[in-house]
Amino acid sequence: MIRLWIHRVKDVMAVSLLFAAVCSLLGVVGVTTLELPVGENVGQWIWLGKSTLFSAACIIITCLLQLVKRDSLKKVMCFFHFSVYVSWSLVLWGSVEAVWGLRQLYGFSASGHSRYALTGSFFNPGPYAGYLAMVLPVCLHLYLRARKERFVRYKIEKVVVAVAGILILCVLPATMSRSAWVAAAVGCGWVAYMHRDKSKWNVLWKRYKRRFILWGVSALFILMLGGAGAFLLKPDSALGRLFLWKITCRAVVNYPSGCDKGFAFAYGEAQEDYFVRGDYEEWEERVAGSPEYVFNEYLSLALTEGVVVCIIVLVAIGTCLWMGAKRGRYGICGAILSLLIFSFSSYPMYFPAFVVAGILLLLACGVGDFIYKPLILCICLILWIGGYTEKWKQEEDACRKWVYAKMFYNSGAYKVANKSYGEIYPVLKEKGAFLFEYGHSLYKSGFYNESNKYLKEACLYSTDPMVLNIIGKNYQELHRY
């Protein structure tokens, strides 16, 4: 009896440690660094490095427990039911984000952006909505699966995921993110379709075929009206993204194997060439800007890494989806579909939270059951031995000093700001906003040649036309027309 009790305690400990190993990685979504410049994610990367070490420690302890229990080598090395751990970790963090958003809506918590009331742990409501949309299909899958079971455990699961889903649905409409709404609808639609009773649907189809066709046509008409309404909700925003994709496609044609100088350089070059030709519409001139992101991860990948790499990644994702569907992991596949749809008109891969979630979801389709334990140990070794954590720490310290230097810059103490900017330049020399501030501060101080040096570097990382304006002013002051 005592041996059985000890055995169960070890099982509970192993399950808890494995859940902590997965949950800690996905916990990067809850990390906020308000002391850093807006939009900087280096604090989340540092957390990821620490959580990877914690995850590796949990896995090692679990393996030792399993060896003590004399489990088979296969059970020790494999991570069985990996998809379950990922699903419940996503439900947990999705619920935390939903509650976070509700607190912001009711004024109990501060938003991450002064212009928006609802951002969750993000600095923009768009990515926040995308994260909630990714979690919602997982909640629906767990609910539909638990609905068919009569055990008390499944009844508790059904209540928990129902509460999580309701919390997300309370917040998601308030984000005003059309991309996230569509992503959530597609992901949940996939899950509901895969959970259908095939025999019952076949009988109903044969009996009410005409009625179903009529309903389908009506639903299509409603979707078209909804699409038109979504467009009219923020028309310039939609037109702006269409123009952004158009110019990015032209840039991809110019750099089919990828542009090593980055998105900003390739996009700025393509947009300049487009307007120089003069063959453009009035609305294109109105919505054109200097974007920081492509708002389409597929075009972004094709532009920066090449079309071939983009195709390889899409094939790999499609293979994982096929494996997940074959294994009945509909919630995981639904979450991936939501992320894929959201990636079509947003920039989720800019955030560590989406990068980690995307990788874990792909692994949860089947491969993770066999390779996750050695994989996380290898990643831990790469991060710590390769010095990535130290690099991220240096960047975080530099960003803190940047905030300090920005105070002098905004107050007009340019000489003091120049000294601070010069100290952190080696670490932040690939950030367009930093280079522009440094160059502009040098311009205000009268160092025109030095200013142009850094502003020309900024052109590689920023499409902001003000960079070129200041370069022109520098040449004007130097009497070089």
PLM-predicted stretches and their roles:
Residues 1-92, 142-162, 192, 196-214, ...:
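Transmembrane signal-anchor hairpin modules in multi-pass inner-membrane enzymes, especially those
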Residues 170-176, 180, 184, 188-253, ...:
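A membrane-periplasm/extracellular boundary helix in multi-pass inner-membrane enzymes
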Residues 265, 334-339, 375-380:
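Central hydrophobic cores of alpha-helical transmembrane segments
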Residues 36-47, 124, 248, 294-296:
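Membrane-interface coil-to-helix junctions
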Residues 124, 241, 351:
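Short, conserved phosphate/pyrophosphate- and ester-handling motifs at nucleotide-, phospho-/glycolipid
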Residues 128-129, 183, 264, 292-300, ...:
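Membrane-embedded glycan transfer/ligation machinery
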Residues 109-116, 250, 260-303:
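Interfacial juxtamembrane loops and adjacent helix segments
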Residues 2, 11-31, 46-68, 78-114, ...:
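Alpha-helical transmembrane segments of multi-pass inner-membrane proteins
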